[in-house]
Regions:
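HAMP exit helix and analogous amphipathic coiled-coil linker helices
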Residues: 2, 76, 85-101
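Membrane-proximal alpha-helical signal-transduction linkers
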Residues: 44-66, 71, 80-82, 87
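Membrane-proximal coiled-coil signaling linkers
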Residues: 91-125
Length: 391
């Protein structure tokens, strides 16, 4: 009897142990399956979130070309799709900005976007420096060209001459045929620097002329570039109206006023003096002393009642040749005598200037003017100024 009881107890213990093992195995399996399921579920949630976070970082860094894959249909998937649509809109706006940056100076585009108050139609009065640059002899050069050839020549010329303006922080306002209008001033350049930047840009434009003539000769298939192909530059500094100017349907952020007109008149005055780059005393006064100028005359331009001293940009100070330095000295002597009506002394000084640099335009012009004034003497109130009749 006792043996049977012991045997039954042993069976019960074995069954109990077996049941415990089965329970442990089932529990372990369930836990493992639960863990795997939890990992799968959490991965399905966190992976889209990680992708979205990485996409946000890419956009913040300026990379807008890679959309995020939408891998779920839940709220995170909807958020990802909305994010992709936002990035596409940003890409579209960036394309617009890049496109218009080729038609309007990129800094103007950026300023109008970032500072909406600049688009106000009232405008502001600021001291600005304005440049006009024109190609002399372009009309004759372009005669007989095909439209395609003319476009190539224009693009080469405008690209070559625009680069120094941009590099020295000028804003190209517009192209007017073969002429360039540019300006320097707030908010793009500090007022204290604008005249210096404009004059340095003008010097570099003149330095590029020889290279441009060579490239045009090759482009047009000419043996020699016509001598009349040259540059005329006018620079003026003074108060101007700055702002968005135009109609209800089209606006232009530009500068207007007497300073702009003076720059245009000085560019045209190069025809009278046979010079390349003329500026006025207000511009000279705001440069830093590293540029060599030569006072050419006193001029009263169309639209202004007061005369002002005009100067030719000769180059960087210290880089003039001995002949150019002698030219400046003799010309200054002649100009002093000319204003004091000492005609023969003035003629002699200008002749000495022409010996230093034969064919110098301003000296040639003043010698001819002395001939005229000796035949038609000026009145007693003459201040030495010449009136520029033509625009």
């Amino acid at each position: 009897m006792l043996a049977q009881v012991n045997a039954s107890a042993a069976v019960v213990l074995r069954n109990q142990h077996h049941a415990i093992l089965i329970t442990i195995a089932v529990t372990t399996l369930a836990a493992a399956l639960g863990l795997v399921f939890a990992l799968l579920v959490s991965g399905g949630i966190t992976r889209p979130v990680r992708l979205l976070l990485e996409g946000t970082r890419q956009v913040e860094a300026g990379y807008l070309d890679q959309p995020i894959d939408v891998i779920t249909g839940d709220e995170i998937g909807q958020l990802t799709a909305a994010f992709n649509r936002m990035v596409e809109q940003l890409r579209h706006k960036e394309r617009i900005r890049e496109t218009f940056g080729r038609y309007v100076d990129p800094r103007v585009v950026e300023a109008l976007i970032d500072q909406p108050k600049l688009a106000a139609v009232e405008g502001q009065r600021r001291v600005m420096t304005v440049m006009f640059c024109d190609m002399k002899g372009f009309t004759n050069l372009s005669a007989g060209m095909t439209p395609q050839g003319l476009v190539k020549v224009m693009n080469l010329y405008l690209s070559t001459m625009s680069e120094p303006i941009r590099r020295h922080r000028g804003v190209i306002d517009k192209y007017i045929g073969d002429a360039i209008m540019a300006y320097w001033g707030p908010p793009f350049v500090e007022e204290a620097d604008e005249a210096q930047f404009a004059c340095v840009a003008a010097i570099e434009i003149i330095e590029r002329l020889a290279k441009l003539r060579g490239e045009l000769t090759e482009l047009l298939g000419l043996r020699v570039m016509p001598a009349e192909v040259d540059l005329r530059i006018g620079i003026a500094t003074g108060e101007a109206l700055v702002g968005s100017i135009g109609s209800d349907i089209m606006m232009n952020y530009t500068v207007m006023g007497d300073t702009v007109n003076l720059a245009a008149r000085l560019e045209a005055a190069n025809k009278l003096y046979g010079s390349r780059a003329l500026t006025a005393d207000a511009t000279v006064a705001k440069t830093d002393g590293t540029i060599q100028f030569r006072e050419v005359d006193r001029l009263r331009v169309v639209g202004q009642t007061q005369s002002q001293a005009i100067f030719e940009l000769m180059g960087r100070k210290g880089e003039l040749t001995p002949a150019q330095s002698l030219l400046c000295a003799r010309y200054a002597e002649g100009l002093t005598a000319y204003r004091e009506r000492r005609w023969e002394q003035a003629r002699g000084a200008f002749a000495a200037a022409l010996e230093a640099v034969p064919g110098d335009g301003p000296a040639t012009t003043l010698v001819k003017r002395i001939d005229y004034l000796q035949q038609s003497p000026p009145g007693p109130d003459w201040d030495g100024a010449w009136r520029l009749e033509a625009k």
